Design a protein with these regions (language model features):
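Short, well-formed alpha-helical segments that are part of the catalytic scaffolds
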Residues: 13-29
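Glycine-rich, basic loop-to-helix element that forms the pyrophosphate-binding segment
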Residues: 65-82
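Conserved donor NDP-sugar-binding/catalytic core segment of glycosyltransferases
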Residues: 98-135
Length: 264
């Protein structure tokens, strides 16, 4: 039986959290013969509300952080208290996603491979009707990253770029296989990742978490693999969709600057 931990991060999104936990209940029940699920909630809400959810098919622990630590900051906060290395898989997730009935069943079927560091599932957007994964199939070149950093320093130019790209964007579909990075809303990390990389330590409040994980996998010769037979639904925008544009650019600038400084 495979042990799976879910580290989910909540910030004043209790309705979405309940829906997320309900979906875990359904998926856990379907896979109760093959997986054991433990859910750990990092609650960044200030003030936090009582989370009174009773499950018959997984264990649940709540960790109020007492302040908003951001996405990976909150995940690290809980991981420092409950080691992800004790599990076969550790999932880091937003609460604005929903598991499908067979999410854990399909994950349990994946053969053990010590070279896997990160598994990216199909993350289907109910808003845009496409799969967010893979987020990137190849590593970004330094020139592209520097251009992106420049744009985040100049929000008006960034907005113009977004308008142009939105007009001409198209969405490709991809077969399963090795990729550079998956999407950050639902991240499946393996025991091998934590054995080689340790618990996550990304000292940026928000954004570019995916590149941090991708670079850690590259550094430690671990694969990032896209496996679309594992299905997750993206509801989208519960917390990050509320961030003002100037703050959005500030966080992105800090994130991309960290990636360039530490990995390029």
């Amino acid at each position: 039986m495979k042990k799976i931990a879910i580290y989910c991060i909540n910030y004043h999104s209790y309705d979405s959290l309940k829906d997320f936990l309900d979906s875990i209940e359904v998926a856990s029940k379907k896979a109760e013969q093959v997986v054991k699920i433990s859910v750990f909630i990092a609650d960044n809400s200030i003030p936090s509300e009582e989370i009174d959810f009773k499950s018959q098919h997984y264990s649940l622990e709540v960790y109020p952080t007492g302040r908003n630590l951001g996405y990976f900051g909150a995940a690290e906060y809980v991981m420092s208290r409950v080691s992800p290395a004790d599990f076969d898989y550790a999932i880091i997730s937003n609460v604005d996603v929903l598991l499908t009935e067979n999410t854990f069943v399909e994950l349990s079927k994946i053969p053990h491979d010590s070279t896997y560091g990160w598994i990216a599932p199909s993350l289907y957007s109910q808003t845009y009707h496409f799969d967010w994964n893979p987020q990137a199939t190849k590593r970004y070149c330094i020139i592209k990253l520097r251009i992106m950093r420049f744009l985040f320093k100049h929000p008006l130019l960034l907005r113009l770029k977004q308008i142009v790209l939105h007009k001409y964007r198209h969405f490709d579909t991809y077969p399963s296989g090795n990729i550079y990075a998956g999407h950050g809303s639902f991240i499946i990390l393996t025991k091998a990742f934590f054995n080689k990389c340790g618990i996550i330590h990304y000292p940026v409040f928000l954004y570019f978490e995916e590149m941090y994980l991708a670079e850690e996998c590259l550094k430690h010769q671990l694969k990032v693999v896209y496996l679309p037979q594992i299905h997750v639904l993206d509801i989208g925008g519960t917390s990050t969709g509320k961030i003002p544009s100037k703050i959005y650019c500030k966080y992105n600038y800090e994130g991309i600057n960290y990636i360039i400084s530490n990995y390029y």
